[in-house]
Amino acid sequence: MTSQVERQSTAIKGGRLLPLPRNIPWWIVILAICGLLILYFITTSTSYQETFTFLASGVIRTLQLTVVGYLFALVFGLIGGLGRISKNTVINTVATLYVEVIRGVPLLVVLIYIAFVLAPAASSLVSQIATALNAPFLDNMAFVFRDDFMRGVLGLSIGYGAYLSEVYRAGIESISRGQMEAARSLGMSYGQSLRYVVLPQAVRVILPPLGNDFIAMLKDSSLVSAIGAVPLEAELTLRGRMYSATTYKAFETWNSVALLYLMMSLGLSVIVRYVERRWSVPK
């Protein structure tokens, strides 16, 4: 009897249940220790303080890039998802082609192709149209294709839009067809049925993958460093590369970069889980 009690997964002490060591989330403990060590070096080492100060300004640019890119990706994903479930052959074919091509190409290649092939071509085309129509305001709009930040946003949003298209499609198809039929029987059009009945329910279903993709985009925003940026406005990874190359402090630089990304990812994970619990579909 005594041996059975000792093998239980919890121990009783002072009338309270305490987890045994094997039930403690040790990965959190290890991360906390590593984070505290790096924070200690940052607060006590002049070299770490200089590195961290230089990199910290890249956090804002990284968050801006992620948020703006994700908002565009949500739009592209919704359009692609609706196209994927469309019964119109042309629309369905175009949406499927977009999804399959983008998902079949590495995101880094997508970013480079958009930044150095599509964006310059689009900028030149808009300028020619503006000249032909004598419309200077159109030429001013071409800055979207010339600005490094906007090219990064377009690359991330188009790349992640393909993945979000499948998320939207799966979420919409998870809703019972009876919901659509009931809405149509009440006199709603197909678009109204999607907008007021199907999509509100689908969004609650797809919240977890949407949140995961947002965090994934935060980390993949580091790929934008491959297309270059204005130094004072560089995102975190590019600032790390610049600082490491000029000071030769690779150890301090990449420890700080990793810590900053980890802090942002864990912080967003907490927010995403809170939103999921608040808006999740009851089981």
List PLM regions with ranges:
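Transmembrane alpha-helices and adjacent helix-loop boundaries
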Residues: 2-283
